[in-house]
Amino acid sequence: QAWLAAGLPESVPAVTIDRKCGSTQQAMDFAAQGVIAGAYDVVIAGGVEMMSRVAMGSNSMGKDNFGALHCMRYPDGLVHQGISAELVASHWDIDRQSLDAFAHRSHQLAAEAAARGITGRDIVAIGNADSDEGVRADTSLKKLSQLKPAFVNEKMIERYPEIAWRVTAGNSSQVSDGASAMLIASEHAVERLRLKPRATLSHFAVAGDDPIMMLTGIIPATRKLLARADLLLDDIDLFEVNEAFSSVVLAWMRELGVGENKVNVNGGALALGHPLGASGGRLTANLLGALEETGGRYGLQTMCEAGGMANATLIERLD
């Protein structure tokens, strides 16, 4: 009912999309694809999440929601994302210090971007909420190093003895409330409505990967998108890779050979939070703001999702 609450005409239709963490990015991609196909003129693509209202895991309540065939394929069961983040850290041999250092970087960059007004231009104040509340400009490596591993589990210790238990609340994304929205329009609609376009969306990719490692789908999704766009990594000016956990982004960087000077340059979910269904729009806003500030042309946005899925989207800044 969000579009009715927003005051849009009753003649305007709406649909709910569920791709977990990538829901808003997928909504954006579907909207752009519909515009490119000529099916739509103007679309509002957005998402919302109130994580403070719903307890994590409350949708299952300890029951098997997947059925016998799923159990036959994965007899030991899937794992939650915290364990997947630990598996990623172990697989790529990412130590605790590197995880914490990346989290510290995120808070520092987010605070600096807010001070410059780069992120604030895309924030619409709702009541007294007019800035991202999760940014901790005063955090330190010492404080982060004192946090205990967040996902230690006796059953998982036995199942995965290779895990060194390095993932903490500090190097994981925050539980957050948030919403985001983007206006996507055809070239004809832009001219007719006298809008000023900021960017174009031209290439898209979705990939699936190991559902137990889960968070690594961003690697094949990135490669798939670049192949479709006939671009190289060096052609991309900036990347926005969702900071679900430090280990996820660091593994992506190591696997693809991308330097951190191009990645999440205005901070990410470790500092800004990760309201699941809304995060795609926040990534786009951060990426576009950074491209506008630096004069870059191409930005690539990618988001890991439940079940080993990931979205990737190519953004081209317009002058």
Predicted regions span which residues?
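Active-site-proximal alpha-helical scaffold in enzymes
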Residues: 1, 17-48, 89-118, 181-188, ...
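Conserved active-site "lid/cap" helical segment
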Residues: 1-6, 10-13, 21, 87-96, ...
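Conserved catalytic cysteine-centered active-site region
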Residues: 1-40, 62, 76-83, 145-174, ...
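Flexible glycine-/small-residue-enriched beta->alpha junction loops
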Residues: 42-91
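Condensing-enzyme catalytic core mediating Claisen C-C bond formation in acyl metabolism
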Residues: 90, 142-216, 220, 227, ...
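Beta-strand segments within the central parallel beta-sheet cores of soluble alpha/beta enzyme folds
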Residues: 13-18, 43-49, 98-105, 122-127, ...
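N-terminal extracellular/periplasmic Venus flytrap/periplasmic-binding protein-like
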Residues: 98-188, 192, 255, 260-262
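Active-site pocket-lining segment
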Residues: 84, 119-122, 202-271
